Design a protein with these regions (language model features):
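Active-site HxH/HxHxD metal-binding segment of metal-dependent hydrolases
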Residues: 51-114
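Pre-active-site segment of Zn-dependent metallo-hydrolases
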Residues: 19, 30-62
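Active-site environment of divalent metal-dependent phosphoester hydrolases
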Residues: 46-48, 69-73, 93-97, 150-152, ...
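Metallo-beta-lactamase
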Residues: 2-9, 15, 36-42, 87-220
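Short His-Asn-centered micro-motif
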Residues: 40-43, 64-68, 88-90, 123, ...
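Short, hydrophobic/aromatic-rich segments at coil-to-beta transitions
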Residues: 12-19, 115-120
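Short beta->alpha connector loops
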Residues: 23-24, 43-47, 67-70, 125-128
Length: 221
């Protein structure tokens, strides 16, 4: 049976990745090894419609706060899915615990449930505890990122090719710009992304995306 969702839309050409938007903010749902769903950066305000659409996709087992600023939807989604694991990086934990009053676990249990083609990335040089997902899928390399990159908004199902830097990111997200830039360029040299799904703005896809990201960081950081 083909999976359908009125709120979470399948990413074109990529199995197991679904995105939902409210305004300029995006939540990404990803299917784990046990067929349950990970929510990357739950977005406040999606409400009952999001919960109903997720029930079509599968049980939600993990709610990932991908940095310490992306926390406004966590309480709402934890009420929806009280059996889900709330997880974050150790760097993000202090502020998340203070702001949300929720109890978070580490990333180990989530990592153990990731498909073989997927890994968590924790960029060097940032101060927010940002966590990315890297997925290899049918020739595509997908990065799911939080505040590091953005793009002009697009319609559902469409892509854009020009990466941008979120205006607040250099001041509030970056601890050491050279360290972060070097880390990103090293990752690109190892396995360049062809798709970037940011939490803000449009989804990026192009053949030279890695080079575009590198050039952007060299110009702006």
């Amino acid at each position: 049976m083909k999976e359908k969702s009125p709120i979470f839309h399948a990413l074109t050409g990529v199995k197991g990745v679904y995105t939902a938007q409210t305004g300029k903010l995006r939540c990404t749902a990803y299917r784990l090894s046990d067929r349950s769903m990970l929510l990357y950066s739950p977005v406040a305000g999606l409400g009952d419609a999001a919960r109903e659409s997720l029930s079509i996709l599968g049980d939600v087992s993990n709610l990932l706060a991908p940095n310490h600023y992306h926390n406004k939807g966590l309480a709402e989604y934890f009420r929806f899915f009280p059996n889900a694991n709330l997880v974050c990086s150790t760097t993000a934990l202090p502020r998340l615990s203070k702001i949300t009053k929720l109890k978070f676990g580490g990333l180990g249990s989530l990592e153990n449930n990731l498909p073989d083609n997927t890994e968590l990335l924790e960029p060097d040089g940032l101060k927010t505890g940002e966590i990315w997902l890297q997925i290899k899928n049918k020739g595509e390399v997908i990065w799911i990122v939080t505040d590091a990159f953005t793009a002009q908004p697009t319609a559902v199902g469409e892509f854009t090719q020009e990466p941008l830097l979120l205006g607040t990111f250099p001041r509030y997200g970056v601890r050491d710009s050279e360290l972060f830039r070097t880390w990103v360029e090293t990752k690109i040299s190892e396995l360049a992304p062809t798709i970037v799904i940011p939490c803000h703005g449009g989804i990026l896809k192009c053949d030279n995306l890695g080079k575009s990201l590198s050039n952007l960081l060299r110009k702006t950081l």
